[in-house]
């Protein structure tokens, strides 16, 4: 699957390997940034100039992870990033990790007005898992270039992530690329399970 816009989620069923792309149906808001803005975020002062109400869920009946460009969430699960780089060394879930649940956050949804004056950005209010969020990072000094996050103990290898789900099952994941099979950067598609 490829993401042509920022308004889609790719749902992954880790049991079957099936992926399904669905339009985001969460509540949305557009922010117009200017010095006279009444609210403030990391980009500056803004006013909310448009909203869209949340619609009924369109997620598949069975899914484990969902990706929105580089954002990742679980299906009511918890995640964490380890400093381990060898996926084969993890045989069961460790007990000494800090599990992180999904949280509601404003995720970038519409960037068509980013280069206009005044700047207008669209956001969706959806879930993200901060324990899994750092599987990649923005490369400093670039405009929108991302790279895999590497382990602190071995900067040449990606860390292993752990995810436990509400049914008691779990996944041990190591992201190995930001590119899909065609070499295009846009989604998570190369996962070692």
What are these regions (language model features)?
Residues 1-193:
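Surface-exposed, beta-sheet-biased, low-hydrophobicity segments with strongly acidic/polar composition
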């Amino acid at each position: 699957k490829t993401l042509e816009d920022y308004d889609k989620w790719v749902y992954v069923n880790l049991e079957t390997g099936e992926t399904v792309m669905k339009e985001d149906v969460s509540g949305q808001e557009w922010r117009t940034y200017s010095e006279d803005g009444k609210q403030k975020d990391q980009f500056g002062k803004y006013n909310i100039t448009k909203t869209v109400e949340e619609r009924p869920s369109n997620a598949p009946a069975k899914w484990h992870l969902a990706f929105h460009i580089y954002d990742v969430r679980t299906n009511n699960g918890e995640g964490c990033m380890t400093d381990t780089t060898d996926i084969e060394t993890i045989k069961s879930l460790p007990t000494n990790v800090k599990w992180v649940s999904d949280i509601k956050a404003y995720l970038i949804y519409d960037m068509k007005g980013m280069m206009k004056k005044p700047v207008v950005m669209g956001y969706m209010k959806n879930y993200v898992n901060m324990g899994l969020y750092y599987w990649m990072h923005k490369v400093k000094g670039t405009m929108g270039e991302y790279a895999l996050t590497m382990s602190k103990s071995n900067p040449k290898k990606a860390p292993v992530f752990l995810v436990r789900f509400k049914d008691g099952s779990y996944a041990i994941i190591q992201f190995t690329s930001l590119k899909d099979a065609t070499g295009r950067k846009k989604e998570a598609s190369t996962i070692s399970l």
